[in-house]
Amino acid sequence: MKVFFSLKFYWTKLKNMDFNITKFQICKKDFYSRHNLGYWNNQKYLGVGPSAHSFDGITRCWNTKLHHVYIEGVNSGQKYYEVERLNTSEKFNDYVLTRLRTMWGLDYKYIAQNFGEAYVKEVSRISEKYNNYLIMENDCITLNTKGKFIADRIASEFFIVDVN
């Protein structure tokens, strides 16, 4: 933890930002990875190659991890990928998993607009339990420094199986 705090202090002093805690991704202001922004902002994306994932807003698919199966499938037209249709709860859980780890966090307005008020109520309820680990401002929830150490636990608490 000492190393984490030292690095965080150093980067902040240089006016860099830690925009994704998962990989300790740090950058200068507004120089974020465009590739990763698509995941974090729940945008559509296409993955090409073995193990690549794609998302079209409704379904998620992923290619086989085996190179020879992928190449053979592409060349012959055989299936080399799996597809799953996401329900609302699964889309919400993906949103939590990707956004909570970023500097932008969970946005109440986005949640209300894309998932409904029942999800907003559940997020509010769980947020109270972890208020010592979260920062709540501008209708957004982000992790404070202590919260970053238990990010997985907090994210799993927000996961919803069914709110109805």
What does each model-identified segment do?
Residues 116-129:
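Short amphipathic alpha-helical interaction segments
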Residues 143-147:
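Basic, amphipathic "hinge/linker" alpha-helix immediately C-terminal to the N-terminal HTH DNA-binding motif
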Residues 1-117, 163:
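C-terminal scaffold of the Radical SAM
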Residues 148-164:
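Short, amphipathic alpha-helical interaction segments positioned at domain boundaries
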Residues 29-31, 139-142:
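Self-splicing inteins and homing endonuclease
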Residues 131-139:
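A short, conserved structural fragment
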